[in-house]
Amino acid sequence: MKTVKLKICIPILLKLIFLIENSNGAQYVGTSASQPNRTDVVWMVPSWPCVDNDSIDVQKFGILQNEDQEFVGGQEFAIFYEHSFGKVPYFKAQNVSDPQNGGLPQLGDLQAHLEQAEIDIKTTIPDENFSGIAVLDIEEFRPAWELSWGVFQVYKTESIRLTRQQYPYWSEKQIEWYAEKDYEKACQKFFIETIRLGKRLRPNAKWGYYLFPKCNGDVGQKQENECSTLFQKFNDNLIWLWAESTALFPSIYLYPTHKQAPDFNFINSGALITETKRIKMNYCPGCEIHVFTKIEYNPYNTPDEFYSKQNLASTIDLAIKMNVNSVVIWSTSQSIRSRCGLLQTYLDNTLGPYLQLTDRSMEKCRQERCEGRGECYLPRPKTNPALYNFACRCERPYFGKSCEYRGRRIGYSKSRPKPSQTRIPDVSAYFRPAAPSFSSISESNRYNAPNQYYNKGSNVGNGQKIELIK
């Protein structure tokens, strides 16, 4: 074995090698970065009524589930729907004649909501050490004025009506301006205080809001493979939401109109997962990514129509290969007893074997691409990817394109520098240049991306010795 020794001055604050990712996606990880994860598959289907001959055993295929496949009191997940959680203000089915808890967020009682929400959280998650995913599912209204189109336009209309009643002598321009600000302020208070409550009560859970980030549904129709710049701006403007989240829950659901379009579905799913990773990198590097999907196109009306293998490849398989934290398979409880046999047959004959095949291919990639020392992942979506299309997230202390190097701490010298002196050393002699920062977001955005990363520089203090062994 050939040993190459290199002395590098690295500030004591870093202690061990920091995470460095080069332009082709290869990484090395020191103790200051988390270990690479394998993608879990979570069964968020309320199939607990399925018993006896129709009992559904998902664990034999490596799928995680709550105990007895219940939605309450489990260890893997908890989900809170606006209709039965706290006192969320909304118009039922966006109908102004059926306001719930005030209808508009501006008219809701935040304190009453938080008091009831605390009871609901403690009931649904009795374990104070719960470390699963906690999903806040509020879909009746959207937390931003610019996202309130289509059926959600009612919240704009009613906000303007409310402002006009409060300030009848204002001009229409003043009324519309204030209505937008008032609506967004109320939305942010409800969303932020709710997730803060959850984090305070169950601090180990991964908290976030379902359906965010978002992407335009027509991506791919004009040969593009990314979410539009408009939707990227929408997501950038939700920086206040990302600042409070510890998990991101995008949805790659397919519907009956998608049945015969697996290629289009692949582009859609890949674009949203890529956009979610962009949000994570720019705004919440500590957030986990849990992608929601289904296995039925419409479990309400056609429960016997399940995803084809091509559409499994466009959703679940792609998310696993892009190495998200988990893929969450969701379904409704409606008519669940009559659907038990259908679910069991699909699980045993299609979904389960498909997941096993994906797992075997990813294990082969780990061994051959990453030398068994890290996780394979696709940096970007690609149909029928070859081994060389994958990159590696290496287990510490390994690093390199194929996790072929091993880093070892030898010692320290002198005192710890001040945080302002902290720099990542230039090790370009051994690695390709780091990938460009994503912090340069358009000045037209309402918010600027925070600087989450250190810049390389020559102003380094006394550091430690690093031995690189190949």
Predicted regions and their residues:
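Extracellular cysteine-rich, disulfide-stabilized repeat modules
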Residues: 376-378, 382-396
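Aromatic- and acid-rich polysaccharide-binding/catalytic face
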Residues: 75-77, 81-90, 94, 140, ...
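Aromatic-lined carbohydrate-recognition surfaces of secreted/lumenal glycan-active proteins
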Residues: 175-234, 284-298
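Disulfide-braced loops of extracellular cysteine-rich modules
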Residues: 365-372
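N-terminal signal peptide
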Residues: 2, 13-39, 470
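Alpha-helical scaffolding within the catalytic cores
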Residues: 64-65, 120, 226-239, 270-280, ...
